[in-house]
């Protein structure tokens, strides 16, 4: 019989495959659409008529659903770091299908992500799934988790009310800090809702419990806040910088929140916990390396010829332009 951890592992890996592939499908769809109309980056919507873009969107939807269900079966310490595999999938597929070459350092980044993921999978704790949403509520009402929530919300409020007006446009940690803290609470709430849905399908109805709807409301609020400030970060700063920092902060805070609320590491020996932490650090290192190679590619100048309209063709100027695309 398949264990919950094995089911969560399969779903998490499937999610990464779907999401990583969806980026390539959507990008190819955008390129086709750009050849027939205005690019999306310049306000065009011709991609909505491109079937390949829709295939990518559906693929991403399947990936997000698989990721959601994975949290129901496995602890966050197993599921969350495996999200880095989607970066590997997209990088490898982009190398072969989009002619976006994967450099040697990028290959090392992929290797680090794979090695770290294997370490986490081997030493991941076996989670004890609660038998009712009321049990999850008791876990959420533990003093340690309430302190985590209080500290997180205090930091979020301080960042929004004080730091954002002062340095939101210059300090990348303001926006990313907000969406990472809210993201950790999103995962905890979504996991609670997912377990309630799973128990309901198994015949133990959890829909009419007020705790279920409270967790659903918290999840909705946190998701909206998370998306608002992630979009602000992407709009203000380079995506090649935002992505690795956000991944590191979001993953770290999610694992901390899950360890406090669900006691993921209870019953594990020190060696297993140390191995998981080492695996996690290895995945983070690989992710940063992968994104740094992309940032280098972005910074490589493209030489372009242009003609001054007031001068002859022989008086052509050369200028180096940096590509705005990520």
From Swiss-Prot:
InterPro entries: Mg_trans_NIPA
Ranges facing Cytoplasmic side: 26-51, 98-104, 164-169, 231-240, 294-326
Topology of this chain in the membrane: Multi-pass membrane protein
GO-annotated cellular components: early endosome; plasma membrane
Keyword Membrane: yes
Keywords noted in UniProt: Cell membrane, Endosome, Ion transport, Magnesium, Membrane, Transmembrane, Transmembrane helix, Transport
Predominant location: membrane
Family: Belongs to the NIPA (TC 2.A.7) family.
Protein name per the record: Probable magnesium transporter NIPA7
């Amino acid at each position: 019989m398949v264990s919950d951890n094995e089911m969560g592992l399969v779903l998490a890996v499937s999610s990464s495959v779907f999401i990583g592939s969806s980026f390539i499908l959507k990008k190819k769809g955008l390129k086709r659409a750009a050849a027939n109309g205005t690019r999306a980056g310049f306000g065009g919507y011709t991609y909505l008529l491109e079937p390949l873009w829709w295939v990518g969107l559906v693929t991403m939807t399947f990936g997000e659903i698989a990721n959601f269900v994975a949290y129901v079966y496995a602890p966050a310490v197993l599921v969350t770091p495996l999200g880095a595999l989607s970066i590997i999938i997209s990088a490898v597929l982009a190398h072969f299908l989009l002619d976006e070459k994967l450099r040697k350092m990028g290959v090392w980044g992929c290797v680090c992500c794979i090695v770290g993921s294997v370490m986490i999978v081997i030493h991941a704790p076996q989670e004890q799934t609660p038998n009712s949403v009321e049990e999850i509520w008791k876990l959420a009402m533990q003093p340690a988790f309430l302190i985590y929530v209080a500290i997180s919300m205090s930091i979020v409020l301080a960042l929004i009310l004080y730091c954002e007006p002062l340095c939101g446009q210059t300090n990348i940690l303001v926006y990313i800090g907000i969406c990472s803290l809210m993201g950790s609470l999103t995962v905890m709430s979504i996991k609670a809702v997912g377990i309630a849905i799973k128990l309901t399908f198994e015949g133990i109805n959890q829909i009419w419990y007020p705790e279920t709807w409270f967790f659903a409301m918290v999840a909705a609020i946190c998701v909206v806040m998370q998306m608002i400030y992630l979009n602000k970060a992407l709009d203000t700063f380079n995506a090649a910088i935002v992505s690795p920092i956000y991944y590191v902060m979001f993953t770290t805070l999610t694992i901390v929140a899950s360890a406090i609320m669900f006691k993921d590491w209870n019953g594990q020996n020190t060696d297993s916990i140390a191995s998981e932490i080492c695996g996690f650090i290895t995945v983070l290192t690989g992710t940063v390396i992968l994104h740094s190679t992309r940032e280098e590619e972005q910074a490589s100048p493209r030489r372009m010829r242009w003609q001054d309209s007031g001068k002859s063709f022989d008086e052509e100027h050369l200028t180096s332009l940096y590509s705005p695309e990520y």
